[in-house]
């Protein structure tokens, strides 16, 4: 239900003041600070209506009011005006990304650090997802008579290096043959699509090279089909402890316990979000009882128009949504651009 203009102004004042001070807000405070052009008595009446409608609530120990989850949701959906990044903040992001522009892992790690630095909350970044990435090429490099390095490169810039044992009878020419066949058959395919049928094709392609067939099959199984979990990068873990909501020891223990659970964090950052753009989930919308007092702002990042990972910010429900949404949006777009440059090999 859409609120009338005066109720919107009162709700906006309560949200802004509570975000800034972490103190319940009274009618006199609103009348003095926000110049709404009405008396404290009128503001009290509007606050009573807002409370009855579920947009604000009264803490047990205070005469003031604070926004409810419903109030925050109304604010984010209808009242919030984004707080754009300063020129200095935008330049900081671009400068830091340019310094790490050739290494995907470092770029993702730096993203977590920047998100937490710019928001003063906890950042969660999911690395590019292996299962949805596409195979670019594989190369076998002889290191010793019985050892070789396998280099697997994905189209999102991820590079896997592994040392493997090889029979001494395998020559550099054999390794080139394996690399050539695998590259011809696998290039452009996702990890999900490299399955049994394709392995049969490769088997028949290399059947005349009996001495290298087993090695090729082993490479596909171990280097390409091996399940690799997407990494979670955290930034500013202890930022949340500076928030008044988390001065309670038990709440701190619960929060830190959650931040240690990678599977849970992976679910939190990937579930409930849109395929593009920024998603804001408030309190109970996160669907996890232990962090009902938190909100999460998330967005996917992409390469060449394909979603490959997600990033987000975890903070109290009293978070600065206007700033956080802008930071997440700006960084998502810049991260996508940087990863595309890495994939294309164009550097800066």
From Swiss-Prot:
GO terms classed as biological process: negative regulation of DNA-templated transcription
Domain of life: Bacteria
Keywords associated with the record: Repressor, Stress response, Transcription, Transcription regulation
SUPFAM superfamilies, per the entry: GAF domain-like (SSF55781), Winged helix' DNA-binding domain (SSF46785)
Listed Gene3D superfamilies: 3.30.450.40, Heat-inducible transcription repressor hrca homolog, domain 3, Winged helix-like DNA-binding domain superfamily/Winged helix DNA-binding domain
A molecular function (GO) term: DNA binding
Family under the similarity heading: Belongs to the HrcA family.
UniProt xrefs under HAMAP family: HrcA
Function recorded in the entry: Negative regulator of class I heat shock genes (grpE-dnaK-dnaJ and groELS operons). Prevents heat-shock induction of these operons.
Descriptive protein name: Heat-inducible transcription repressor HrcA
Origin organism lineage: Bacteria, Bacillati, Bacillota, Clostridia, Eubacteriales
